[in-house]
Amino acid sequence: MRPAQTNQFDYVKIGLASPERIRQWGERTLPNGQVVGEVTKPETINYRTLKPEMDGLFCERIFGPAKDWECHCGKYKRVRHRGIVCERCGVEVTESRVRRHRMGYIKLAAPVAHVWYLKGIPSYISILLDMPLRDVEQIVYFNSYVVLSPGNAETLTYKQLLSEDQWLEIEDQIYSEDSQLQGVEVGIGAEALLRLLADINLEQEAESLREEIGSAKGQKRAKLIKRLRVIDNFIATGSKPEWMVMTVIPVIPPDLRPMVQLDGGRFATSDLNDLYRRVINRNNRLARLQEILAPEIIVRNEKRMLQEAVDALIDNGRRGRTVVGANNRPLKSLSDIIEGKQGRFRQNLLGKRVDYSGRSVIVVGPKLKIHQCGLPREMAIELFQPFVINRLIRSGMVNNIKAAKKLISRNDPSVWDVLEEVIEGHPVMLNRAPTLHRLGIQAFEPILVEGRAIQLHPLVCPAFNADFDGDQMAVHVPLSLESQAEARLLMLASNNILSPATGRPIITPSQDMVLGAYYLTAENPGATKGAGKYFASLDDVIMAFQQEQIDLHAYIYVRFDGEVESDQPDTDPLEVTNNDDGSRTVLYKYRRVREDAQGNLISQYVRTTPGRVIYNKAIQEALAS
């Protein structure tokens, strides 16, 4: 049993993290007082023992044990040692799933700028510093120096960019014997950026910007407002500008960037491990160069390479050359994992796969009722499997779940009969993405069909904005009796005839249906085959048409003693004939009537076409059913 989740939360807030906060995420103090959490080695696992290397990217001391209830050295095994920290290897005896959420960190030997805030659009670092992005990049990537403090030098201004030669010239002046220059400070790289950002007093800056905006106009005013908005956001969230330059970077849990052994003994690893390894290697090399007091040019080059390695880790390809793997494939950075359709948010958090659902291509089902849909058999047996198993056990056909599953997997004929019983009266919900209004999900009664495509009634297509050119739809099964009742009463397609947006009918015939109705009821005086024939009933007309004795549009007379409505009143007789038996035959424009001497109707023949008879019969049958 897993412990119940007690720490409920309302929302997730994304913001800048301070170096102290990043250390807090990964740092833990062991019972012996040792502080762990910093990843210092680029190694992942020992290829001989296949165990994680200590202080490496998969370190068990930092991230937790690789096996449940077992320390690294093997001194403690089994759940009875729960919570003990091994005094030999320093690994806590706990579940291995802690490796999915325990983090580490890398302490950088030199600060690096966060590429999102440097190269994003807009670039927040350049907005805050009120410098062009090109100049900020020149500083970060060690191409230009920047004046941090002009001192008493008249030729220098705060934030002025200097080339290598200009700085060497000024340096010579500073260190010459008769120099008058004092307090001149010049920096390069992210360290200089850190200093510039730390020097910004947000409240004062916001105050002066508000005063400036009052008198500014046009482009300058828009620029000032943009800068003020960024500064106000920093003040509101309690973030500091210098946090956009990182001195500590977090290492995500190892089980989120796994390393798995393949059949041939080789290992497949997440791209993040390669990117982290590059950062650690360059960071360690830089620390060593600083220790041995290496020449400035070498240290600067190493700092630039560290900046590029961290850029690639956070957002590969955002700036400079894209880091590629073994087969010239760009490595997936943290940004690539988060963003886009296949990213963590859209793929895993917003759109999850759910049980009792399926999806398939839709095809037209012209023989379906409006509240029905055709559900493929193999899909239905999977969706309704628990109900089928329950029915099989209750009916005594099998004794347990295992036997029922075996029966289903064998496609036993009795299973299909049970499935028919189960789905009777059990609505399913069909959804077509994108669900733009409530009619994007509707309930239908499933009808089992052969094949692998879902059959949909053509009249409900406008509500789903569906067509049959390869569209796919998802099926969901409501499980509880309450949800089934709700689906039947509120969501059934036959209950959703009017659009909730406009109040107009959304179920309207279109395309083939309109064309078919028009063709059946159209008049064509040129159709002469069988024209003028008399028929005793509507069925006789259809039979004659099927035997090809009459054309679909030929004018015929069919006996129909009921009331006849027409567009124009048909009351003026064209011809009246008196018969020998006292009755009379009256010929109107659209009918022929025989009456007795008192004017009572004996028989009536209506002029129509076989097409109209077929149309009439189809509507009558639909209404009757």
UniProtKB/Swiss-Prot annotation:
Binding note for cofactor: Binds 1 Mg(2+) ion per subunit.
CDD domains, sorted: RNAP_beta'_N
Q: Which GO terms describe its molecular function?
A: DNA binding; DNA-directed RNA polymerase activity; magnesium ion binding; zinc ion binding
**Cofactor(s) required, per the database record:** Mg(2+); Zn(2+)
Q: Does the record bear Nucleotidyltransferase in its keywords?
A: yes
> What EC number(s) does its UniProt record assign?
2.7.7.6
User: Which UniProt keyword terms apply here?
Assistant: DNA-directed RNA polymerase, Magnesium, Metal-binding, Nucleotidyltransferase, Transcription, Transferase, Zinc
Biological process (GO), any one: DNA-templated transcription
Which superkingdom heads the taxonomic lineage of this protein's source?
Bacteria
Please write the reaction equations for the catalytic activity of this protein: RNA(n) + a ribonucleoside 5'-triphosphate = RNA(n+1) + diphosphate
Return the GO cellular component terms, semicolon-separated: DNA-directed RNA polymerase complex
Q: What are the binding positions for Mg(2+) in this chain? A: D467, D469, D471
Can you tell me which residues bind Zn(2+)? C71, C73, C86, C89
Q: Tell me, what does this protein do in biology?
A: DNA-dependent RNA polymerase catalyzes the transcription of DNA into RNA using the four ribonucleoside triphosphates as substrates.
Identify its protein family.
Belongs to the RNA polymerase beta' chain family. RpoC1 subfamily.
Q: Quaternary structure per UniProt?
A: In cyanobacteria the RNAP catalytic core is composed of 2 alpha, 1 beta, 1 beta', 1 gamma and 1 omega subunit. When a sigma factor is associated with the core the holoenzyme is formed, which can initiate transcription.
HAMAP family (UniProt xref): RNApol_bact_RpoC1
- Name recorded for this polypeptide: DNA-directed RNA polymerase subunit gamma
Q: What is the lineage of its organism?
A: Bacteria, Bacillati, Cyanobacteriota, Cyanophyceae, Nostocales
What is the gene called?
rpoC1
